[in-house]
Amino acid sequence: MNTIFTIILTITILVLSLILKDLLFEGRIKKINKLIPGPSTIPVFGNLLQINAKDFPKSVNDFYERYGKVFRLRLGSVEIVVLTGPEVIDECFNKKHREIFKERYIKFSRFFGKDYNIISSNGDYHYVLRGILTSEITTRKLNNGRLESNKFILEMFSNLCKDNKETLVKNTPNQIRILAVKLILNFTLGIEENDETILIIVEKIKCIFEAAGLLIYSDYLPFLFPLDIKSMSKNDIISSYFFLKDFIGIKLDAIKIKYEKENELKNETTDETSSKLNNIPIIENYYKNYLDGSIHYDSILFSISDIIFAAVDSTSNGFSLLIGQLINKPEIQDKIYEEIMRNDENNNTNNISFADHTKYPYIISVMNESYRYNSSVPITEPNKTTEDVEVNGYKIAKGTMIIKNLRGTHLSKEFWGEDALEFKPERFKNQPLYQKGLFHFGAGPRGCPGGRFTESLTFTFLVIMLKNFKIVNPTDIPIDVEGEVGLAMQCKPFDALFIKHTNRNDFSKINKGLNQQCFTSSSQFPTCYQTEFFEFGFNGNFQLNDGIDCSSGVQQLSFFEKGFVFRVDHFLFEF
């Protein structure tokens, strides 16, 4: 009884002390930032109790709609300024104030990786860790097959669909996660794991990202840490993290043994070895830098963990949300398919690489719109100011936590017009990747180092998938493409019907039946052949028109690499 009384008394005294400190003492940051608009605060908690713990990004975006592009929050003891909008974010992170905003604000929950991993390190050491990764995902290396993405993508569809014309894929997002894990493990660790291990890793990563996206109160009031620990333990987030860290540790031990037994990567100088050097897994590059004394041993484990967590979850959810959009808007699928067929001169699209992406402007516009509409991370890891700075007419104090509101930046009508909440690739027509106004990979020196990696995977995945399949909703209920809050937005489960496109070589049977034949009306065109033509991407765009004035002349239609002649007074098919 005395113990309980002592605990209650201690907590009461602590809270009263914090209240008095809050009311009577005004620190430098608070004094400067108080002129920035924002919601009123209460002692100790600030605005913490006004935040929806299960949807922090929505709460932040609601405040933006009330207080504007630059506003102030105080969560517990932490002074925060939230920035929204392409111009403001671009000015702060890419242009005028780039150097002032480049440091990471290390939240309480991130201290275990402080100065050891890519996400939570600062200064020169951060750029060493970051540079090891970015040196392996240059555009040249991606174009030259640094990723074996085609192999894994084709393997997934082969296993799922086999020889069936139509295949119902249950819980499609989970199948995409499995694909992402296989890709990323091969890229980072150079391994291909068994299906049982892959499924365990999928669940562990999903668990971490779902739970870590919720509000962690001790990030703002450290004395609440025991409550957060209890919550994290309940959600298995801690055990999941250490499972993956131990898994990576086992692979690292194997690399250590390999390097102790032989020094072939240093001694061999043949062209064959040079090729191997260009394709060794990321973890070996980190280990080589450890041997050189450039990084700590623990940085290998922490950095590889960062890469696997971030790449698997954000990439897989981005893929799944995009598939959902394409199912809801089949006309976009049709346009993509037509573009693929126009470029597929040698029926070789399954071997496509990111080097070909400039030939596919419509696919690039779809990718840009997907990055806008379905930002993987609606609020990125926070930065902090390294000196006082004025933004949009407001002075922000040195040491302030800075949050980028990407949900508002990408979806607000203020920046994108009345159709901001519509998935509309045409808004990026004939524009390259990395469009102004898009910050899906963050911004500035602390932007996501794996952006080009993700773009390469997304492009390859889209082309291979839609070259081979039309994806259909098996129900009348539209796919939910809003996602659920996590550290990255989580795509809700849905089923999808994958229908194989007819192989273009099957045109031989159409050729045999129709070559050099004329038809004066659509009624004379054999139904069996109509079906084949519709499967080749014409779905509603190709019609046999009766009763058209013969004086209209002749129109030429592009039909793959073959000539397709359309006459208004009759139909002549030339292959």
From Swiss-Prot:
Key word Membrane present: yes
Determine if NADP is one of this entry's keywords. no
Q: What Enzyme Commission number(s) apply to this enzyme?
A: 1.14.-.-
- Which terms are listed as keywords in the entry? Heme, Iron, Membrane, Metal-binding, Monooxygenase, Oxidoreductase, Transmembrane, Transmembrane helix
Ranges that cross the membrane: 4-24
Where in the chain are disulfide-linked cysteines found? none
Which membrane topology describes this protein? Single-pass membrane protein
User: What are the annotated GO cellular component locations?
Assistant: membrane
What compartments host this protein? Answer: Membrane
Gene3D superfamilies linked to this entry: Cytochrome P450
Q: What is its main location?
A: membrane
| Cofactor dependency | heme
User: What InterPro entries does its record include?
Assistant: Cyt_P450, Cyt_P450_CS, Cyt_P450_E_grp-I, Cyt_P450_sf
Stored SUPFAM superfamilies: Cytochrome P450 (SSF48264)
The terms under GO molecular function for this entry are: heme binding; iron ion binding; monooxygenase activity; oxidoreductase activity, acting on paired donors, with incorporation or reduction of molecular oxygen
Tell me any Pfam family this protein matches: p450
Q: Where does heme bind?
A: C448
Q: Which family does it belong to?
A: Belongs to the cytochrome P450 family.
Which PANTHER family does this UniProt record tie to the protein? CYTOCHROME P450 514A1-RELATED (PTHR24303:SF37), HEME-BINDING MONOOXYGENASE FAMILY (PTHR24303)
Q: What is this protein called?
A: Probable cytochrome P450 514A1
Species: Dictyostelium discoideum (Social amoeba)
